[in-house]
């Protein structure tokens, strides 16, 4: 079954033009929201989609451009729709997502006292594929981003790598292509500067051309147009466009 991808946003954390790097991944009957940043509510509004049209949400890590829209999602589902949306995430993210991120805005004595009061929390194993729907299988892969904070990239349907925010890991990319038949790579990209917590364009350009041809770039800065024609064999993912994966 062919998956489809629609990026709600393709921008980095400080982008003003492209919204936060959040995505809809869907098959015929199921829509998964991958990350739900500050701009997700407006991004959904712009493509005429409601929270009700989403079947589940998955979080890769707890920075605001990836989780900042969860407070609205939780309140909308609880107060307006009277249901809890399934929330997929690594076990290691459950406590910090509530205690360090959502509790301050969502907590209501006797009503909302934990993440489970507003979401159906479904911890996912790391390094083992799990079926999210009949057409979507995914595996969490721990990847490096911020020291001391967990971040998880995704391996979808045994062939599609979707990077969380991560520093360059060429060994992982080569291993996925060589040993696991990966043929689509959706990769975050810092267009310029040193890659202390992100993967840079210069680093991705060191990959062989046959791998570059598999790569779609996302999580980029607002000066993206300045880099057209300077990204080797790679391509930019475009906001709101629907892709067959």
UniProtKB/Swiss-Prot annotation:
Positions with a binding annotation for Zn(2+) 2: 61, 63, 145
Residue span of region Beta-lactamase-like: 19-219
Residues that, per the record, bind Zn(2+) 1: 65-66, 165, 219
Cofactor(s) named in the record: Zn(2+)
Cofactor binding note of this UniProt entry: Coordinates 2 Zn(2+) ions. One protomer coordinates the metal ions and the opposing protomer provides the catalytic residues required for cCMP hydrolysis.
Catalyzed reactions: 3',5'-cyclic CMP + H2O = CMP + H(+); 3',5'-cyclic UMP + H2O = UMP + H(+)
Keyword list, A-Z: Hydrolase, Metal-binding, Zinc
Signal peptide, first to last residue: none
Assembly and interaction partners: Homodimer.
Additional information: This homolog of an antiviral immune evasion nuclease may be due to cryptic prophages, or it may play a role in regulating the endogenous antiviral defense system based on cyclic nucleotides.
Known role: Counteracts the endogenous Pycsar antiviral defense system. Phosphodiesterase that enables metal-dependent hydrolysis of host cyclic nucleotide Pycsar defense signals such as cCMP and cUMP.
Protein's name according to its UniProt entry: Anti-Pycsar protein Apyc1
Organism of this sequence: Paenibacillus lemnae
């Amino acid at each position: 079954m062919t998956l489809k991808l629609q990026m709600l946003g393709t921008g980095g954390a400080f982008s003003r033009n492209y919204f936060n790097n959040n995505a809809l991944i869907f098959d015929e009957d199921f829509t998964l929201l991958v990350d739900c940043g500050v701009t997700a509510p407006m991004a959904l509004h712009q493509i005429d989609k409601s929270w009700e049209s989403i079947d589940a949400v998955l979080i890769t890590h707890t920075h605001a451009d990836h989780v900042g829209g969860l407070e609205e999602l939780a309140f909308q589902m609880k107060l307006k729709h009277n249901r809890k949306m399934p929330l997929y995430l690594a076990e290691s993210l459950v406590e910090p997502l509530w205690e360090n991120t959502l509790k301050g805005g969502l907590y209501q004595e006797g009503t909302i006292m934990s993440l489970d009061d507003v979401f159906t929390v479904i911890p996912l194993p790391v390094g083992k594929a799990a079926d999210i729907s009949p057409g979507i299988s995914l595996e969490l892969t721990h990847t490096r981003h911020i020291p001391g904070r967990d971040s998880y990239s995704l391996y979808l349907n045994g062939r599609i790598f979707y990077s969380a925010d991560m520093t360059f890991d060429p060994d992982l990319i080569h291993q996925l292509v060589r040993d696991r038949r990966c043929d689509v790579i959706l990769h975050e990209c810092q267009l310029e500067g040193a890659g202390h917590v992100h993967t840079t364009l210069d680093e991705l350009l060191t990959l062989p051309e046959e791998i570059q041809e598999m790569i779609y770039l996302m999580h980029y800065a607002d000066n993206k147009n300045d880099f057209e024609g300077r990204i080797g064999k790679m391509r930019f993912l475009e906001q709101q466009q629907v892709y067959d994966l």
